[in-house]
C-alpha cells in the first residue's frame, strides 16, 4: 500500500519535473553538502578546561535551561541524540577548550593526544572534525588582546596556542581522511576611542604569519580567518576587521570565514560570498542569526539562510565553501537548538537545489525581470516539503515535528538527572 508520504513524493516529482528539476539528482547533491555542527551549543561555550569559569571575549550565552552537558561523555551523548534527528552528512566543529586530560594543560601545550577520544568518536560516527583555537576565557586574554597584544610574552603565548591548534587540526584530517577547517577568531579590540589603530594590526599580521609558517598537508588541514564588527567591551575598535582579514586571506590564500552575525545589522553575508570567492580559494561560513547584534540565535529557515544556501548552489561552490553553524542559546533545550538550526540549514540547501536556476538565468540575461521575480516567488510554493520528508525517510530520521518527542523523551530520561 502506498503511504501518504510516498504519494506526496510522487506528486512532488511531477511538479518539479514540470519546471525542469530532477528531484533525485537534487537529493544526491544534498548528500554532497555536509553541515558542520558546533559543539559549544551543548554546554554554552563552557568547555572542559575550566567549566566553572566565565565566558569572555565579548560574547554571551544567555539563559539557564536545565540539562547542559558537564563533561565530554555527556556532550558526545547529546550530540549523538541530535545527529540521529538530522538527515544527511554532518561534521563536528570543536574548540580547543574541549580537550580531555587528567591534568591541566596550558593552551600553548595542547596536543593531538588531548583530542584522541573525539577522533575515535568521530570515526565511529563517520564524521569529519573541524577545529578552532580558543583565544578567550583565559587570564592572558583578560585585557582584551591576544594575537595583537603589545606584550611580546602574551602575544607569543597565543601564537603558540594557534600553532599547536593547527597540529591538532592536521591530526584530525589525517586520521579521518577529510580536511579539518581550522578557524582563527580573536576578540582583540577596544571599548572606547582608539588612537593607534595601526600598531595592533601590524602585530596581528606578523603573528598570523608566524602561526601559519609551518607547512601542513592541505589534504589534512585548512586555515581560515574570521572578522568581526564589534563585541561586548570592544565596541569602538576591532583589530581583526573585515578589511583586515579579507586582505590577509587574499594575500596569503587562506580561507576566509564569514559569520552571519559579525557585520553591521544591515549587511548580509549572502551578498559577500560571490565577491570573496573572486579572491580567496575557499570560504568558511558561520551561519547564525543576529538579532540586533551578534546574538547567535538559533538559525531559522529565513530569507538570509535561504540566500546563503542559494549562493552556494547557484554558483556550484560545493568544493570551495565549508558550511558551519555558530549559535548558542541557553534559554531552550540545547539538543532541540542543534536540531532546529541544522535541519533549517539543510532545508535551505534542498530548496536551493530545487530551484529552476537555469531558467531564471535565461530570464535575467534577457532582461525579463518581471518573469524572473514571478518565477522566484512561484517556486517558493512548489512542494519541496514532500521532497524533504522523503530525504528524511531515506536517512532514517523523523520527517516532521515528531523529532521533538524524541528530544522530550531524552530530556526526561537523561537531561533531567543532570540538575
From Swiss-Prot:
Its EC number is 5.3.1.14. Its main location: cytoplasm. HAMAP family: RhaA. Keywords: Cytoplasm, Isomerase, Manganese, Metal-binding, Rhamnose metabolism. One of its GO terms (biological process) is L-lyxose metabolic process. GO terms for cellular component: cytoplasm. PANTHER family: L-RHAMNOSE ISOMERASE. Mn(2+) binds at residues 262, 294, 296. It comes from Escherichia coli O1:K1 / APEC. This is L-rhamnose isomerase. It is found in: Cytoplasm. One of its GO terms (molecular function) is manganese ion binding. Catalyzes the interconversion of L-rhamnose and L-rhamnulose. Homotetramer. Its cofactor is Mn(2+). Binds 1 Mn(2+) ion per subunit. It catalyses: L-rhamnopyranose = L-rhamnulose. Belongs to the rhamnose isomerase family.
Amino acid at each position: 500500500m502506498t503511504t501518504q508520504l510516498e504519494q506526496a513524493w510522487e506528486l512532488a516529482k511531477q511538479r518539479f519535473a514540470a519546471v525542469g528539476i530532477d528531484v533525485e539528482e537534487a537529493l544526491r547533491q544534498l548528500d554532497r553538502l555536509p553541515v558542520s555542527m558546533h559543539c559549544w551549543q551543548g554546554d554554552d561555550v563552557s568547555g572542559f578546561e575550566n567549566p566553572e569559569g566565565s565566558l569572555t571575549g565579548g560574547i554571551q550565552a544567555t539563559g539557564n535551561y536545565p540539562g547542559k552537558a558537564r563533561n565530554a561523555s555527556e556532550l558526545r551523548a547529546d550530540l549523538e541524540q541530535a545527529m540521529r534527528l538530522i538527515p544527511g552528512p554532518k561534521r563536528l566543529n570543536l574548540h580547543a577548550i574541549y580537550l580531555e586530560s587528567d591534568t591541566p594543560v596550558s593552551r600553548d601545550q595542547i596536543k593531538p593526544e588531548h583530542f584522541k577520544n573525539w577522533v575515535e568518536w568521530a570515526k565511529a560516527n563517520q564524521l569529519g572534525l573541524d577545529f578552532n583555537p580558543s583565544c578567550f576565557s583565559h587570564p592572558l586574554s583578560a585585557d582584551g588582546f591576544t594575537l595583537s597584544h603589545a606584550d611580546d610574552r602574551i602575544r607569543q603565548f597565543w601564537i603558540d596556542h594557534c600553532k599547536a591548534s593547527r597540529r591538532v587540526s592536521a591530526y584530525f584530517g589525517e586520521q579521518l581522511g577529510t580536511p579539518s577547517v581550522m578557524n582563527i577568531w580573536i576578540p582583540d579590540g577596544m571599548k572606547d576611542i582608539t588612537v593607534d589603530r595601526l600598531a595592533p594590526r601590524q602585530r596581528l599580521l606578523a603573528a598570523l604569519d608566524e602561526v601559519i609558517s609551518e607547512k601542513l598537508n592541505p589534504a589534512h588541514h585548512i586555515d581560515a580567518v574570521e572578522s568581526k564588527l564589534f563585541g561586548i567591551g570592544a565596541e569602538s575598535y576591532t583589530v581583526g576587521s573585515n578589511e583586515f582579514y579579507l586582505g590577509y586571506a587574499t594575500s596569503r590564500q587562506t580561507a576566509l570565514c564569514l559569520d552571519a552575525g559579525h557585520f553591521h545589522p544591515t549587511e548580509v553575508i549572502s551578498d559577500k560570498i560571490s565577491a570573496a570567492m573572486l579572491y580567496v580559494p575557499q570560504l568558511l561560513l558561520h551561519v547564525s542569526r543576529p538579532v540586533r547584534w551578534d546574538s547567535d540565535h538559533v538559525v531559522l529557515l529565513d530569507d538570509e539562510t535561504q540566500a546563503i544556501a542559494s549562493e552556494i548552489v547557484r554558483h556550484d561552490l560545493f568544493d570551495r565553501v565549508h558550511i558551519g553553524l555558530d549559535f548558542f542559546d541557553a534559554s531552550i533545550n540545547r539538543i532541540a537548538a542543534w536540531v532546529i538550526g541544522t535541519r533549517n540549514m539543510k532545508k535551505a540547501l534542498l530548496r536551493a537545489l530545487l530551484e529552476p536556476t537555469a531558467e531564471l538565468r535565461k530570464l535575467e540575461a534577457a532582461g525579463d525581470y518581471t518573469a524572473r521575480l514571478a518565477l522566484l516567488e512561484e517556486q517558493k510554493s512548489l512542494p519541496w516539503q514532500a521532497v524533504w520528508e522523503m530525504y528524511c525517510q531515506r536517512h532514517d530520521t523523523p520527517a516532521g515535528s515528531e523529532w521533538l518527542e524524541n528530544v522530550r523523551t531524552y530530556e526526561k530520561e537523561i537531561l533531567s538527572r543532570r540538575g
